[in-house]
């Protein structure tokens, strides 16, 4: 099951951040994620989402970009430029899930 971290949609000009699950992230990280998503949508259109798979790998999913080739290049650029941030987010998501599981066991 994938856990959505954030998403943006160029058509509706909307940004979504999963505040319920990841709200404890620092505001500057939330802001950076918003910039990543909104700039992607502004540049190539369509939708973008950042989520974690079962092994806590950050997955970038895109849909319906106006420019398919530009979208692929933009995703590769994001992955390259934000590799350190994404690695830390993956570690954070894994630790957060482990803490949540421990809390559930205790209650």
Q: What function would you assign to each model-found segment?
A:
Residues 1-43:
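Negatively charged, low-complexity tracts enriched in Asp/Glu with abundant Ser/Thr
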Residues 1-3, 98-107:
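Short acidic DE-rich linear segments
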Residues 5, 35, 75, 84, ...:
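Intrinsically disordered, low-complexity segments enriched in glycine/proline and serine/threonine
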Residues 23, 41, 82, 104-105:
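Short, flexible coil/linker elements and helix-boundary hinge sites characteristic
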Residues 40-95:
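Amphipathic protein-protein interaction modules
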């Amino acid at each position: 099951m994938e856990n959505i971290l954030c998403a943006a949609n160029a058509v509706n000009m909307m940004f979504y951040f999963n505040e319920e699950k990841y709200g404890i992230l620092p505001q500057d990280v939330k802001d950076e994620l918003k910039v990543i998503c909104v700039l992607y949508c502004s540049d190539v259109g369509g939708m973008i989402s950042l989520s974690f798979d079962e092994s806590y790998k950050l997955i970038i999913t895109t849909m319906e970009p106006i420019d398919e080739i530009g979208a692929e290049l933009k995703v590769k650029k994001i992955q390259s430029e934000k590799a350190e941030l994404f690695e830390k987010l993956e570690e954070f998501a894994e630790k957060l899930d482990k803490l949540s599981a421990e809390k559930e066991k205790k209650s």
